[in-house]
Amino acid sequence: MKKYLALTMAACMALSLAACGSSASSTTSSSAAASTEATSDSAATAEATGSDNITGIAQCCDVGTLDDESFNQGCWEAVKGYGDESGIEYNYYLPSGEDASDEDRETLIRQAVADGANTIVCVGYLYGPALAWGATEYPDVHFIAVDVNGFDINRENGTIPENVFCVTFKEEEAGYLAGYAAVKDGFTKLGFLGGQAVPAVIRYGYGYVQGADAAAQELGINVQMNYYYGAQFYGDEKITAKMDGWYDGGTEVVFACGGGIWTSAAEAADKHDGKLIGVDVDQNYLGVEGVESGKYKANPFVTSAMKGLGAAVKNGLDTVNAGDWSTIAGTNGNFGLEEGDYVGLPTDEASWNFSTFTLDEYNTVLEKIRNGEIKVDNTSDDATKPTTSSNITVDYQV
């Protein structure tokens, strides 16, 4: 666990930003999509480096696409980067659609093992039941489970199998920082667009509400927020129409939290001169590229609420390959500001698109969260809404 506690935000950002570089292609079948990214050069490197503990890496996604420019891709770039650097063969496996079942996810694990993977990165909370099966079926395979906790795997007592390491994040802290910064920067009509109402998305959203409320109280103003889960991790005409309605009704900035669902918010924002907050990785480059290509009139991204996906995946792989699995076996690393700089907003000048909110103000509130002066509610139950003051009105829409 010490390896994780030693991470810095620089490492997190470097790996997260790697997601900007490319999107992998895939071949589809009726049940899954898989791609092998190994090359002859990688094989030669493997002989030189002697990768004895990991013989093959797989990333299995619970839902969505690989090139979502967010969660799935942030993890994949870490897997790909690790394989390229170490010379270890790596693959990815995708379910065939948004309605994939636990059995479909079990099939992906089975296929990954058949293809030679002995270390599998399972990405997404929905992988819990399939992991319970896979850990028993393949006791010699190491599973790194991102956004999965013990109760997702074992709903009776939360026990994590010895060949599984769970990685979760305190998304509520990143969401808080985004909401706080937005209101301090002058936005008073906010929106939260979630994908599916899964725990990580809920924590991001509820943190966003709490941060916006705190800033409104400090400023002595009233703010309004629209709040909605789109029940999917991709953008489409339905979600775009919903966002058109928000922006047309006065919403100034939307925190789009849910894989590729951001595309609908960005499309609507461009039509209405609105703004956007990205998620999981620094998504500012998407706005920059959109302007350069003529897709957007202006960069809609104000900031992004990030978590160290790439760093967590890389260090998990390092631990396996170093033969140190016993240090994390059967545990859940839950990472936030107390543990290190695992969550936050991008502070690089190119991505700092606030008008009045300063880096000093950001660092002040960040340290208050880190030292416990500010406590952010980490509720991940959609039925339990965060407690707020009269300074914020939240319209929870269905």
Placement of each model-derived feature along the sequence:
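Bacterial signal peptide processing site
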Residues: G21-S23
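A residue-level marker of the well-folded mature domains of exported/periplasmic proteins
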Residues: S26, S30-E37, D41-V398
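Positively charged n-region of N-terminal signal peptides that target proteins for export
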Residues: M1-A11
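C-terminal motif of bacterial Sec signal peptides marking the signal peptidase cleavage site
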Residues: S16-A19
